[in-house]
Curated annotation (Swiss-Prot):
Residues 205-331 form the C2 domain. Gene3D superfamilies: C2 domain. The lineage of its organism: Eukaryota, Metazoa, Chordata, Craniata, Vertebrata. It comes from Mus musculus (Mouse). Residues 56-75, 134-176 are annotated as: Disordered. PANTHER family: C2 CALCIUM-DEPENDENT DOMAIN-CONTAINING PROTEIN 4D, C2 DOMAIN-CONTAINING PROTEIN. Transmembrane segments: none annotated. Residues 56-71 have a biased composition (Basic and acidic residues). Residues 139-149 have a biased composition (Low complexity). This is C2 calcium-dependent domain-containing protein 4D.
Length: 341
């Protein structure tokens, strides 16, 4: 106490200074019965506002002012799995009240659905898949559901149209468009072109090559597909040669452009699978009888090593052609008439 008195501290003086302070610094005790003051945005048990959803107003336009958003008359598929959210035009959307933008209005359904009367156009339509293989030639009338195997939900166009109406219907943005074909016509023709599978024996150490040949007389294109090689001999381990993998070299004799074509390299396999196509252009029908195919199978050298020959063969080109490719084949005459599918 003596030390505090020397420092100038007095107990009574400190209490007097505290009482003389600003009254806002000293909290006042509130009476128990007085209501508590708080922010009006804070919800308390005794202050719960009453939510009010205004009633739906009538549309001033009425039924006459409605605009048909689907002038083409087509039933468009709805991209929604909830039937109660499908509108009258067939689109899936959340209706909004014209007099409020509250979140509660998003859950209000259309009038027809609320009254229990579902509109005829609000049903979900799922169009059947288009199984047409190629595009049919254009015509004035669309295919009817009776003639189509799957039945199209689109309404058919009128069968009789004047020249003016036909021209305007084709250029209209709402004119029905045919769906793209499932398979292109070139893809189907490629499947219908005749091909021939051949097996070439390799010498002198054995093995064979499997080829598939196709010839198009129109552009004069020869396609050789190298499928695989079987029974290749083991590469001899010599210092400074081989060890890089197996590849095949194909060329036509006498040489034509492009010259020798090389396949990809398959590592460490006696039965490599290639599945590669080789094309030779500019081959006329008279040239097929005087040319031959020469194939070489090499063991590629790795780094500075040299290539090692595993086998080779040479076969007349006419023996590899399919029998239906313009009547060409062993023992057939080279006539200028050729079939090109």
């Amino acid at each position: 106490m003596w030390l505090l008195e020397k420092a100038g501290y007095r107990v009574r003086t400190a209490e007097a200074r505290a009482l003389q302070a600003h009254p806002s610094l000293v909290p006042k005790r509130q009476a128990r019965g007085s209501p508590s003051r708080c922010n009006p945005n804070v919800l308390t048990p005794d202050r719960i506002p009453q939510f009010f959803i205004p009633p739906r107003l009538r549309d001033p336009r009425g039924a006459e002012g409605r605009v048909d958003r689907n002038p083409g008359g087509r039933n468009l598929p709805v991209a929604c799995s909830l039937p109660h959210l499908a509108g009258r035009e067939g689109w899936a959307f959340l209706p909004e009240s014209p007099h409020t933008r509250r979140r509660e209005s998003l859950f209000h359904g259309p009038r027809g659905l609320a009254a229990g009367l579902a509109p005829a156009q609000s049903r979900l339509h799922v169009s059947a898949p288009d199984l047409r293989l190629c595009r049919a030639p254009d015509s004035d009338t669309a295919s009817s559901p009776d003639s189509s195997p799957c039945g199209s939900p689109h309404t058919p166009r009128p069968q009789s149209l004047s020249p003016d109406e036909a021209s305007s219907a084709d250029t209209s943005p709402y004119a029905p468009r045919r769906a793209p074909p499932l398979f292109h016509l070139d893809f189907l023709c490629c499947q219908l072109r005749p091909t021939k599978d051949s097996v070439l024996r390799l010498g002198p150490r054995g093995g064979q090559l499997r080829l598939s040949t196709e010839y198009q007389a129109g552009p004069g294109r020869l396609r050789l597909r190298l499928v695989s090689a079987e029974g290749l001999p083991r590469p001899r381990t010599r210092p400074g040669s081989g060890g890089g993998g197996c590849c095949v070299i194909l060329r036509l004799q006498p040489r034509v452009r492009p010259g020798a074509q090389r396949s990809r390299v398959v590592q460490s396999s006696c039965n490599p699978i290639f599945n590669e196509d080789f094309f030779f252009e500019g081959l006329r029908p008279p040239d097929l009888a005087v040319r031959s195919l020469r194939a070489k199978v090499l063991d590629r050298g790795a780094g500075l090593r040299r290539d090692v020959l595993l086998g080779e063969c040479e076969t007349p080109l006419i023996a590899l052609l399919p029998p239906l490719a313009g009547g060409l084949g062993p023992g057939s005459s080279l006539a200028p008439t050729h079939l090109s599918l």
